[in-house]
Regions:
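Local sequence-structure signature of Cys/Sec-based thiol-disulfide redox active-site neighborhoods
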Residues: 2-42
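Glycine-/small-residue-rich active-site loops that bind phosphorylated ligands and cofactors
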Residues: 23, 47-48, 76-77
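Generic recognition of short, well-ordered alpha-helical segments
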Residues: 27-30, 51-54, 80
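Thiol-based oxidoreductase modules, predominantly thioredoxin-like and allied folds used
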Residues: 37-53
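Short amphipathic alpha-helix with an adjacent loop that forms part of the alpha/beta core around
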Residues: 51-60, 87-92
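Structural micro-motif
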Residues: 59-69
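Non-catalytic, surface beta->alpha helical segment in thiol-disulfide oxidoreductase systems
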Residues: 70-93
Length: 93
């Protein structure tokens, strides 16, 4: 088991670490937009996002599982359904 990399800083209540090509990422982001849920998106494959990619890998024992969602309370979830993300968002508010 590896150590969890430094948790990325974010100001959003929900930050989705994603890729542009993976269908589960696209679906989650579409569902969040449809619900008008406040969120931020970090493309883990974009240049300059190596630290974010390392964090995503670290939370699943060196496997990069996307989407990974980071909540403003510091908790996270990997590949969550939109309903779970929206429920957590309501809990945070």
């Amino acid at each position: 088991m590896i150590d969890v990399a430094t948790t990325p800083e974010t100001t959003a209540p929900v930050t989705v670490f994603a890729t542009s090509w993976y269908p589960f990422c696209s679906q989650l982001l579409a569902d969040l937009r449809k619900a008008d849920a406040p969120h931020e998106v970090v493309d883990v494959e974009a240049p300059g996002n190596e630290d974010a990619s390392a964090w995503v890998e670290s939370v699943k024992n060196d496997n990069r599982v996307v989407p990974t969602v980071l909540y403003s309370d510091g908790s996270h979830a990997t590949n969550p359904p939109a309903g779970d993300v929206l429920a957590k968002l309501n809990e945070l508010n």
